[in-house]
C-alpha cells in the first residue's frame, strides 16, 4: 500500500470514530432529556414515594397505642395528680375508694389480703397502717383507754356478702347510706378499719372522744365525719378510720374537711 493510500485510510478511520462518538453523545443526551421530561410530567410518583417513605419511617419510630396499659396518668380539673393503677385511682398518691371511685375485684390490699377481719396483727392492712395504729393504741393505753381493730381488710367478695345481707332487711337506697357496695368499700383498700364496738355509741365513749381528737397525730382521719354526710355519701361513723399520713391527716383535721373535700372529688354512685 502506497503512502498516499495509508493517509487516506487513517483519515477515514478518524472520521468513523468521530461519527460514532458523536452518535453516542447524542443518544445519551436524548435519553437524559426523555427521563427528565417523564418525571416532570408525572410528579405524583415522586410525591407518593415521599409519602410512603415518611409513613414507613413514622411507623417504625412511633410506638403503637397500647390500650392494655396498667397505669395511666392525667391531671384533674382541680390540679391534683391522678393515677389509675390496676383499676384503682390514686389522687396525689392517696388511694381513693368511695361511691365514685371503685377498686377492682382483684385488688387485695397488702400481701394478698388474706381473709380475716380480726387478726393479730391485722392481715391485709399495709405495714405503715399497722405501725401507726400500734403506736396510737399504746398511747391510748397509757391514758387508760382501750382501742382495738374490730374489722380490718375485707375482700371484694366479703363485702359483697355484707352488702347483700343488709339488703335482706333494708332497701338498697337505705343500705347505701351505711354500707358500701362491693368494690366501693374502703375496707378493701388496706388503709381503713373499724374500731371497738362499730356503732354510734363509740362516739360518746372516752375512747371515741380521744380518737376523734388525736388520731390525726398518727396519720388517721375519721373517714365519715359528722356534718359531711352529703359529701361522703355515708352516715357519720366515729369508729371508721382511714390512714392518709400525718401531714394530710393533720391538714384535714385542722380545716374540718373530709377526704372528698381535700382531694376535690365527689362520692356518688353512677346508678
Model-found features: residue ranges?
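Extracytoplasmic cell-surface/polysaccharide-interacting catalytic and binding patches
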Residues: 2-152, 156-271
Amino acid at each position: 500500500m502506497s503512502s498516499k493510500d495509508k493517509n487516506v485510510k487513517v483519515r477515514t478511520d478518524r472520521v468513523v470514530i468521530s461519527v460514532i462518538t458523536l452518535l453516542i453523545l447524542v443518544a445519551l443526551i436524548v435519553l437524559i432529556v426523555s427521563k427528565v421530561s417523564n418525571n416532570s410530567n408525572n410528579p405524583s410518583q415522586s410525591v407518593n414515594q415521599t409519602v410512603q417513605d415518611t409513613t414507613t419511617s413514622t411507623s417504625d419510630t412511633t410506638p403503637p397505642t397500647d390500650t392494655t396499659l396498667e397505669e395511666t396518668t392525667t391531671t384533674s380539673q382541680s390540679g391534683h395528680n391522678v393515677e389509675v393503677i390496676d383499676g384503682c385511682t390514686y389522687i396525689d398518691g392517696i388511694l381513693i375508694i368511695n361511691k365514685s371511685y371503685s377498686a377492682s375485684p382483684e385488688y387485695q390490699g397488702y400481701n394478698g389480703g388474706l381473709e380475716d377481719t380480726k387478726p393479730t396483727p391485722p392481715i391485709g392492712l399495709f405495714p405503715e397502717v399497722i405501725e401507726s395504729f400500734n403506736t396510737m393504741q399504746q398511747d391510748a393505753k397509757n391514758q387508760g383507754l382501750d382501742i382495738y381493730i374490730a374489722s380490718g381488710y375485707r375482700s371484694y367478695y366479703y363485702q359483697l356478702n355484707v352488702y347483700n345481707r343488709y339488703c335482706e332487711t333494708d332497701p338498697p337506697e337505705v343500705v347505701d347510706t351505711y354500707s358500701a357496695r362491693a368494690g366501693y368499700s374502703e375496707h378493701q383498700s388496706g388503709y381503713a378499719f373499724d374500731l371497738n364496738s362499730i356503732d354510734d355509741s363509740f362516739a360518746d365513749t372516752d375512747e371515741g372522744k380521744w380518737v376523734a381528737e388525736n388520731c390525726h397525730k398518727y396519720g388517721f382521719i375519721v373517714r365519715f365525719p359528722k356534718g359531711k354526710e352529703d359529701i361522703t355519701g355515708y352516715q357519720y361513723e366515729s369508729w371508721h378510720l382511714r390512714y392518709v399520713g400525718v401531714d394530710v391527716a393533720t391538714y384535714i383535721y385542722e380545716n374540718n374537711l373530709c377526704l372528698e373535700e381535700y382531694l376535690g372529688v365527689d362520692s356518688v354512685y353512677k346508678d
